[in-house]
From Swiss-Prot:
Belongs to the RNA polymerase alpha chain family. The lineage of its organism: Bacteria, Pseudomonadati, Pseudomonadota, Alphaproteobacteria, Rickettsiales. Its EC number is 2.7.7.6. It comes from Orientia tsutsugamushi (strain Boryong) (Rickettsia tsutsugamushi). GO terms for cellular component: cytoplasm; DNA-directed RNA polymerase complex. This is DNA-directed RNA polymerase subunit alpha. Pfam families: RNA_pol_A_bac, RNA_pol_A_CTD, RNA_pol_L. Residues 254-342 are annotated as: Alpha C-terminal domain (alpha-CTD). InterPro entries: DNA-dir_RNA_pol_insert, DNA-dir_RNA_pol_RpoA/D/Rpb3, DNA-dir_RpoA, RBP11-like, RNAP_asu_C, RNApol_insert_sf. Residues 1-239 are annotated as: Alpha N-terminal domain (alpha-NTD). NCBIfam families: PRK05182.1-2, PRK05182.2-5, rpoA. The N-terminal domain is essential for RNAP assembly and basal transcription, whereas the C-terminal domain is involved in interaction with transcriptional regulators and with upstream promoter elements. It catalyses: RNA(n) + a ribonucleoside 5'-triphosphate = RNA(n+1) + diphosphate. One of its GO terms (molecular function) is protein dimerization activity.
Length: 342
């Protein structure tokens, strides 16, 4: 692969920042702003991320329930005010978080009168499972009645109808539920203009993500981006060659402030002349000297010393510094490189 081909992507402007902003102080709803993007990429990325967010993220959902004496969705449940259809809809809205297991058994046992909530569900397998909306109402149970229910919770992705969930492992008499595994509830995006320098023909992608709390919105967006990256790898049918980066002449190992010329420090004329007479050219030359050595300099007194100490302190430097690698072997080339950069 040639450098010419690499310019197809390396020459494009890349986003420099992602801003995260909670909506209405709700941690489960965030707006994320990405800019700048090349013209047209805002729409391309926004649409792709939205589709992946709504279809491909994994989560957990209750996939079946079993109530003694109840054989199908139209059967009445003794002592419960709601129809079984309403109970099923309410159970589908129970938010379950389970990371370490693929499938677990849950149990609900309540004696009336009671408002049956999701927080009353217990985990029979003693697995690491959490109900995130414990106050969510499932049904209302009348006095003198008991409600027993076995539930199965599974991991999956996207939306799976009951016809695809039914299998031979299902207990006899189990009622299957349509499962919405995806932890992302809503995604919307818009594209606005972004300014780079004086140019406004770049895109700004503003994407808003709402989740059910199993995963936070910014993590969900990161997962969607990772899924896209993984899926697109198959189309890259060439070997990339890393560009050789010019050597930085040890600038990374030496404090660049040491390469400053002392005349850049805006010292008094007296101090400047003293340093010049002592052939002190760089800040590195200066901090390598001790205070005692400096006071032995002709016409250099305590006042000049205090002036220099104050200036050096602004750079977190001081007299008599050791182990600073000064002077470096290639001082002239490093100084030239420093001047070119600054």
């Amino acid at each position: 692969m040639t450098t010419f081909l690499a310019k197809n992507w390396s020459s494009l402007i890349k986003p420099t920042k992602v801003q995260y902003e909670a909506v209405d102080n709700n941690p489960n709803i965030k707006t994320m702003v990405v800019e700048p993007l090349e013209r047209g990429l805002g729409l391309t990325l926004g649409n792709s991320l939205r589709r992946v967010l709504l279809s491909s993220l994994r989560g957990a959902a209750i996939t079946s329930i079993k109530i003694p004496g109840v054989e199908h969705e139209l059967s009445p449940v003794s002592g419960v005010k709601e129809d079984l259809t309403d109970i099923i809809l309410n159970i589908r809205d129970v938010i379950v978080k389970m990371d370490s297991v693929q499938k677990c058994n849950l149990r609900l046992e309540v004696t009336g009168p009671a408002v049956v909530t999701a927080g009353m569900i217990t985990v029979t397998d003693k697995q690491d499972v959490t109900i995130l909306n414990p106050q969510h109402v499932i049904c209302n149970l009348s006095k003198g009645f008991n409600l027993e229910m076995d539930l199965i919770c599974e991991q999956g992705k996207g939306y799976v109808p009951t016809s695809c969930l039914h299998n031979s492992d299902s207990p006899i008499g189990a009622i299957h539920l349509d499962a919405l595994f995806n932890p992302v509830r809503r995604v919307s995006y818009k594209v606005e203009n972004s300014m780079v320098g004086q140019m406004t023909n770049y895109d700004k992608l503003i994407i808003t993500v709402e989740t059910n709390g199993v995963v936070n919105p910014d993590a969900a967006l990161g997962l969607a981006a990772r899924i896209l990256l993984d899926q697109l790898q198959v189309f890259i049918n060439f070997q990339e060659v890393e560009e050789e980066k010019p050597e930085k002449l040890e600038l990374q190992t030496i404090n660049p402030v040491l390469l400053k010329k002392v005349y850049e420090l805006e010292l008094s004329v007296r101090s400047q002349n003293c340093l010049k007479n002592e052939n002190i050219v760089y800040v590195g030359d200066l901090v390598a000297r001790t205070e005692t050595q400096m006071l032995k300099t002709a016409n250099f007194g305590r006042k000049s010393l205090n002036e220099l100490k104050k200036v050096l302190a602004n750079f977190n430097l001081e007299f008599g510094m050791k182990d600073i690698g000064w002077p470096p072997d290639n001082l002239e080339s490093l100084a030239k490189k420093h001047e070119d950069q600054y």
